[in-house]
Amino acid sequence: MGARRTRGAKFMRMTFHLILGAAALLATASVSAVPKGDEPIAVPRTIKQGIDFVYVDPQMSSVAKRRQRPQNWLQRVLSFDSGASSRKNAPNPLFVQLGRGLQQYQASWGRLPQVKIPAGAALRRGSTGKRVDLLRTRLGLSPGGGYDEQLVQIVTAYQGVHGLSPADGIAGKATIASLNRGATYYARRIAINLERAYRLPPTRTFNRYVVVDSGAAETYLFDRDRVADRMRVVVGSAKTKTPMMAVIMRSAKVNPYWNVPPELIQSLTAKRVNEQGLSYLKDFHYEVLSDWTATAQLVEPKTINWKQVAKGKSGILVRQLPGPWNSMGNMKFEMPNDYGIYLHDTPHKELFAENDRWLSNGCVRLQDYRRFATWVFGDVPQAASPREQRFELPRPVPIYMTYLTVAPSANGVVFRPDPYGLDALAMPQMFGAPSKMASAFDPKQTAGGG
């Protein structure tokens, strides 16, 4: 067994020699103060977007600074031993699972011939010809057998691992494009996600913490490094991404106001007022304020030049009143940050039944705020009146907002779509120029679709 493991580790290092070059290119996660500014989110230049967190709270920054990143971490992953000693020395369980997944991916798909298959009509059961022979070779079968049942099963398995839907055994345009990207491309995507996993809390750092995964549009509640609960969330769209940041949740508000971000006042609120008149504000329970202080005065909407607001030449402050119509729903969980990002309830529960949940303006909408509040407080806080009321958390809870496009599975990994395009952004940061096989195809094309 030991000899086999040694041979396997050597093979991994040989097969993924391009990946190993990343070790020299990667640096410790940058720690930087969050810049002041309105939406859209302005990320510090020192941050590698798609890889690093913005550490908002000084306590989170100090945790990040204490971590010493091993220079040869990627080599360690490729020669990973799944024994107890390796698990003990790993930064966190997800890192271990993805490291094992990288090995299993290499064993299942990395050693296959990396031949190119020309574009053409979809290939399916019964198809024959040169392209079918190339497909068989690419997937480790001998040529000449046609598109038989064995090939159907292997194509179906490949589609399932690589996030190609439907996984129907038909080699269509997206499947051929995925195969032509080559194993190095996908191994690098696993490595990018290992980088993201490395930045999550090390084992035994916090008793309780929350991980918001914008790549999966899901949230995980951790008790002593084990998932105590999970739920679907709605996160930012591709245009208004939920940022990768580490922050501490310290309070929550029941019956919250929604303070409309300046960008939305210009692009949405002012536009609707100009189209529908001032009645729009009343119909949707908006009010204009003089400032954000406790003694703020209401501003008469008819005194405002809404056309100038829509052009961005006049700034105003708008908030939505508490109630069933409010975009924050019944409860907002506050995490002090200059991005205006919160976890909150929503009146639009129907969205959680959808697979496409990349719909918000950057905030995180919770599928079940009551379940979340019970985990945080021990019970759901009750306001004394319909007015907004603030509740301090019994203990501050760290929140890690990450972005994972590869998930560990029983047989290795499963690739997800890259809705924010952050894998494509991180690829040159980690590896320089794309590999020849990857660059031969459109880098903007997603892996999804059969």
List PLM regions with ranges.
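Well-ordered beta-sheet/strand-loop patches within structured domains
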Residues: 34-142, 149, 156-167, 173-450
